[in-house]
A protein has these predicted regions:
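Beta-rich accessory regions
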Residues: 10-15, 255-281, 286-495
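Beta-rich carbohydrate-recognition and catalytic domains
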Residues: 1-166, 171-216, 229-278, 301-352, ...
């Protein structure tokens, strides 16, 4: 039987969400039906559809009282809202149904594994986090009567019961279920623990998969763990990271570790580390394996240090997901590219080749806020490079966001300080990028309220939200020195 708290959330979502017009949302990026969203949850393929659940507060545009919102899609671009999947309606999750993942059971049902949050103590000040499950049919989910399935009694000594969250569950080829969960030691240094189960309901501690040892920030949130191109990959979102060059500048950052496990699959050793995204707004990524074998990732296109609430009350929603991205490992690094399904939504091609830029310039037909651009730049004179190239977009007389490249520094910077956002806010990030004989390739995707930049065929990415008024449709170029550019621009449309 569905709890009254969940029934109320479902009714509220449907009624209040209907008041938001499609024009007030991005075209392709998933936004909450109503209210607030942060982490993607339960990203999975089930019964012929992609399912995406999301951390949701339907009642306001700020974080509070986490529910699981729910959308489905057949192509990862057209999202249909389904009723709220879970509400904080049990004693063990009364202070929040936190993040988790999904797996299909042998009987065809889908199991959601999530973190339930309760409070203890005489003044209810201590937050306790445990792992719980719910089982359903893709629409309605019922919480297991034996929850929590992993209580704090199954934590090794010295690990935090207050920071013990975000289970990633999968089923191995031998039928064993495993999950990894983020936690930390008393000094808050991150630890990933691994559990195993025969039925996804009764769990035992298996190992400490990996310890941070204060190398990459502190607590590691939202772990994802999978095999890609013959390598074992761990994604996580560390808190309180310190910068390393231009990487990990967001405080709450994202980390990719590529390596291997031991023979018993109980311990992970990394060989390569990198930031997943070098922009401003990217957190808590989750992945799935598509039916055609692609590993696809989606993330919260926001950051805890840069939650700009400007205009959120009027829009009645806050937070959006990135475009889904296809992942590969190339040259020992994680590469990301927009899902190929987006190519089917390109129209109105405008192309220029060998354009000479020297100063400020606009090009006829190059404008818009829902566009997909492929840009290649190189110095006109290979013996003497230019000082700077800048792409300005979401531009009018008052506003603009810029993407600028300085070849002598090898840096690419995204900067939204003139986008209309409040001043006391994170505005810019830089990435150290490579050129191929002086040539830099960029793919820039704009979708009304965001920019996603894919550098050198996905070797690096930079992501940022921009809440600039949609009347700012301009795109222009500005250089210090002579730059030769090829550009192809497509409008993006939705049927």
């Amino acid at each position: 039987m569905i709890n009254q708290k969940l029934l109320f959330a479902r009714a509220y979502e449907k009624e209040a969400g209907a008041e938001i017009s499609a024009d007030a949302r991005p075209v392709f990026h998933m936004t909450p039906q109503i209210g607030w969203t942060n982490d993607p949850n339960g990203f999975s393929y089930y019964k012929g559809q992609y399912h995406l659940f999301y951390q949701s507060n339907p009642y306001d545009t700020v974080w509070n009282a986490m529910h699981w919102g729910h959308v489905v899609s057949t192509d990862l671009l057209h999202w249909q809202y389904l009723p709220c999947a879970m509400a904080p309606d049990e004693p063990y999750d009364s202070f929040g149904v936190f993040s988790g993942t999904a797996v299909v059971l042998p009987d065809g049902k889908q199991l959601l594994m999530y973190t339930g949050v309760r409070k203890e103590g005489g003044d209810l000040r201590e937050e306790v986090q445990t792992q719980c499950v719910a089982i359903g049919d893709g629409l309605d989910y019922h919480k297991y009567e034996g929850n929590p399935v992993i209580d704090v009694t199954k934590l090794p000594e010295g690990l935090s019961r207050n920071d013990f969250r975000d289970p990633k569950i999968w089923r191995d080829s031998d039928g064993t279920y495993r999950c990894v969960v983020g936690t930390c030691r008393k000094n808050r240094s991150g630890v990933i623990v691994q559990y195993c189960s025969k039925d996804a309901l009764h769990w035992e501690f298996e190992s400490i998969l990996i310890e941070n040892n204060e190398r990459f920030g502190l607590m590691w949130e939202c772990p994802d763990y999978f095999v890609l191109d013959g390598k074992q990959v761990l994604l996580c979102s560390p808190q309180d990271m310190l910068p390393e060059g231009f990487e990990f500048r967001n405080g709450n950052g994202t980390l990719c570790l590529i390596g291997h496990t031991d023979e018993g699959k109980k311990h992970f050793t990394y060989e390569h580390s990198q930031a997943i995204d070098n922009g401003i707004d990217f957190y808590a990524p989750q992945t799935l394996m598509a039916p055609d074998g692609r590993r696809i990732m989606i993330a919260w296109m926001q950051n805890w240090d840069s939650c700009d609430q400007q205009g959120a009350k009027e829009r009645k929603w806050f937070g959006q997901m990135t475009l889904p991205r296809e992942l590969t490992i190339e040259n020992g690094r994680l590469y990301q590219r927009p899902i190929r399904e987006l190519l089917q939504h390109r129209s109105n091609k405008v192309e220029y080749k060998n354009v000479l830029l020297d100063g400020q310039m606009t090009l006829e037909g190059i404008e818009g806020r829902t566009v997909d651009m492929e840009i290649t730049i190189r110095p006109k004179d290979k013996e003497k490079s230019f000082q700077k190239f800048a792409l300005w977009f979401a531009q009018n007389e008052k506003f603009r966001t810029s993407l600028s490249f300085k070849p002598y520094e090898g840096t690419l910077k995204i900067d939204r300080k003139f986008s209309g956002s409040r001043r006391a806010f994170v505005h810019q990030r830089r990435a150290q990028v490579k050129t191929n004989d002086g040539e830099l390739k960029l793919r820039v995707i704009l979708d009304r309220f965001s920019a996603e930049v894919f550098i050198n065929d996905g070797e690096q990415t930079m992501t940022a939200t921009i809440m600039t008024d949609l009347s700012a449709q301009g795109i222009s170029f500005c250089t210090d020195g002579q730059v030769e550019m090829d550009i192809v621009k497509y409008d993006l449309f939705k049927e």
